[in-house]
Each structure stands twice: as C-alpha cells, then as structure tokens.
C-alpha cells in the first residue's frame, strides 16, 4: 500500500484539510496542505472552507482550531501529543494570580490549555505577542506560561509591568550558552538565529530572534551561508528546501520535541480512515476560551 497516495485519496473523499506545524517530521510537512507556525495555522483553521481539519501538531493547537471553528470536525492524529510547557500552567493557579492582580490583563501564549485560555483576556503567539501587548491599554500584564517569551516581550515593551508565570519549553530551555559559543568559534562568520522561547543568555548572544516563520524568512532572505538554528530541528526541512547552498548547525546536533515528532504517516492515515481522535470541548468552556483567541486575531495584526 502506498500510504501517501491513500492519505491523499481519503483526504479528497472526505473533503478534509491537513495542517502541519514546522516541527512535524518531513513526511508530514510534505503531505500537508498548509505548513506553518501556530498563528498562521490558527488563521487557516478559522478561515478554511473544509469541514474536517486534521491537525498534525500537539493538542493545544487542535483545541485552538476547535475553539475557533466549533462547527468543524477537528482531528488530532495522536491524542498523546501534548505540550510540557502548556501543562505547566494551571487554571487554578491562574485564578489565584488574577485575584492577586485584579487590574492586570491576562495574556496567555497559545501554548496553553483550553482551561487557561478561558481565564485569559487575550491569547498570543511568538510572532504577534509584541503587537498584542502594545495594543493593550493596561500597564500590568500577567503573562503565561513561558517565562522566556514573556521576558523577551517585556524587554520590547518597557512601559509595561509583567507578572511572569514560571513555565518554559524543555527543548529550548536545555540549550547552554557554552554550546553556542563553541559553534561560533568553530565557524567564522556564522549567524545565530534563536526562538524567543530560549533563555535570556541565549537571546543575548544571538544575531536574530524570531518565531519559526520569522526564522525561516530571515534565513531565506539572508546572504549569509552559515547559521546556528536554535529551535526545534523540524524547521530545517523548510530551510533546506529553500537554501540548498546554506549550512545549518543545531546545538548539540539535536533539538527534538518528542511530542511534535509523534505523528507519523500511518497515524495520519488511520485518523482519516476511522475519523477518530476528534477534539471535543464543552461549549461553555469553549465560549470563554474563544474570547481570548478572538482578541488575538483582533489585536495581533
């Protein structure tokens, strides 16, 4: 059986659309209708005509698609594909923080559970967080769950006071300054490109900081030939497609999000064939979470 052709056949029969994040395995990226970062994919999910969305990513992404389009069937091929950082933020903890800071606006990274989104004023991604914070009148901001993205945006918006949740991405947090300095010393003229989920000490020695889509755009438009890429290595698939003459180096030779790498072509095929692993969200909860995502699209540009 040619599983790729079978997937395309099932997709056509069912009128489905396949979305994939940049961190997915190359085979999934290649068969997807759209590949992108969280913000781009959330817009596609909201605006697409198809009534069946197969989201090759992690759970919070598929949940966001369902929140935005409750009338559509949203399928996550591997239900176990979660996000460690998203799990670090709890609704109970956020409710307590809101009581302690009643005048603060709550901005949650899209890498959050539906329950956290429901208690937040606005959602954001790494590509639109600065715009959103600047568009808020309030000076006090509760930002969760990523302390690294939060501190990065805090540097960009010094007129705001941030209360940061103590969460982080285990993949980006693991990178040490010494490894980046080693790579720099071994490759003269190399540019360092980092995701804002990296720690401040990594951001401070980087030449460019941006979301996955911003990293790809920066590298594609750069005349430089060598890059240290400090984000999940799935982005290398797109970078190599667009810059065959360029050299890319990943810290320690490996930056892997195991949850993002769970989804295989077989999983995608099985989910389309059986129409299983549908995302279901309580309507009252969905409506509360919807406001934060609606405000993201309104304020994020």
Swiss-Prot record:
Its cofactor is [4Fe-4S] cluster. Binds 1 [4Fe-4S] cluster per subunit. GO terms for biological process: 'de novo' NAD biosynthetic process from L-aspartate. It holds the Pfam family NadA. It catalyses: iminosuccinate + dihydroxyacetone phosphate = quinolinate + phosphate + 2 H2O + H(+). InterPro entries: NadA, NadA_sf, Quinolinate_synth_type2. It comes from the Bacteria. Pathway: Cofactor biosynthesis; NAD(+) biosynthesis; quinolinate from iminoaspartate: step 1/1. Its main location: cytoplasm. [4Fe-4S] cluster binds at residues 83, 169, 257. PANTHER family: QUINOLINATE SYNTHASE, CHLOROPLASTIC, QUINOLINATE SYNTHETASE A. Catalyzes the condensation of iminoaspartate with dihydroxyacetone phosphate to form quinolinate. This is Quinolinate synthase.
